[in-house]
Structure formats: C-alpha cells, structure tokens
C-alpha cells in the first residue's frame, strides 16, 4: 500500500527528511526548483557518477532524470570533469568575450542545419522571452501559439496552460492582457494549429518544446 511504501521511504531516508525540514525554514516550499516539490519530502543527493546518484543516507539510485535531460554522458564523465577543471583554473567569471563562445557557436551551427546565428543566454526562460520579443518586433504582430503542457520557462507568457489554466485564463500574478495574447492548442493537433493561423492574422510566432 502507499502507507507501506512511504513508511519504507522514511525509514531509508532520515537524512533527507531532516534536511527537508531545515529547508522549509529558509526556502519557499523548502525547494529551489518546482520539480523537486515531492511528498512526503524530496531526496537530498550527495554525489553522482555515471548513471547513478547517492543520497545523503548512502542509498544508490539509477538516475533516469539526467540533470533535467542535460547529462547525455552521465554524471562526472572523466573528459567533462577534466575540461571543467581546466577551465576553472583559467578563471571563473571574466565579464568579457571569450574565444570559446565563438567555437561553441560554430559547433551549434554545424550540428543544426537550420541555425544561421546563435545567441547565448543565461537561462531557458531568458531565451524564450527574448525570442518572443524578437518575433513580435520583426512581424509587428502580437499573439503567439503555444502547446498545452509544453514548458518554456517562467516568465508571464509561459505559465498559462503548462500545468493548469488550460482554458487560457491568467495564472495568479499574471495580467489578463498578457494571457489573452497566448493561444493554447493541443499537442500534435496540426489541424487545430492550421485553423488558428488561418483565422487570426495577428500571430507573431509558434513556440514548440521539441522534447515535449
């Protein structure tokens, strides 16, 4: 039963429970990322290597999350670790241009045929915010199409229709006139997208989460 599972979980993870209680005193909801809001509490991970993670109580887990999908080579891959250590030895924050950003941009362009130029940002939220602003500036149009449940960050245009408010109404703290310019469509429904585009001449962009 669920109670037996939760009981076994608590028995094996007292360190995570203690840290969770401490976190609730200093972090909103006791977490630093919404995906870690779990009941009765989330695990606290101490180390990781390859496909495995270990919590603060020494329990080992197979990691199917992979750093939100970013760790294609697993945790602590020797070549990645060596490269990071080498880079840290040269400095941590230059506040200036760096040769590797040119090398990196060329690598992205070579890997993605449709890309002509690359703009690096500090987060996915910042990237999608700037992309939508650019699309509106270029087209002179206002609205954009989003797929329900697709995640594109946490700015105001992206909260409606991700985990709730699938009717397009504004989530708490978001202005109604922002939500009204977001058109939500069902994932994988090409006919619905075509219908919206055909019936509304004020569409600046369609945004898609490729892995959604």
Q: What residue ranges belong to the model's regions?
A:
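Solvent-exposed alpha-helices and their adjacent loops that cap or buttress functional pockets
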Residues: 45-46, 109-113, 136-139, 173-178, ...
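Conserved PLP-anchoring active-site segment centered on the Schiff-base-forming lysine
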Residues: 137-158
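Short beta-strands and strand-loop turn motifs
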Residues: 3, 62-65, 205-211
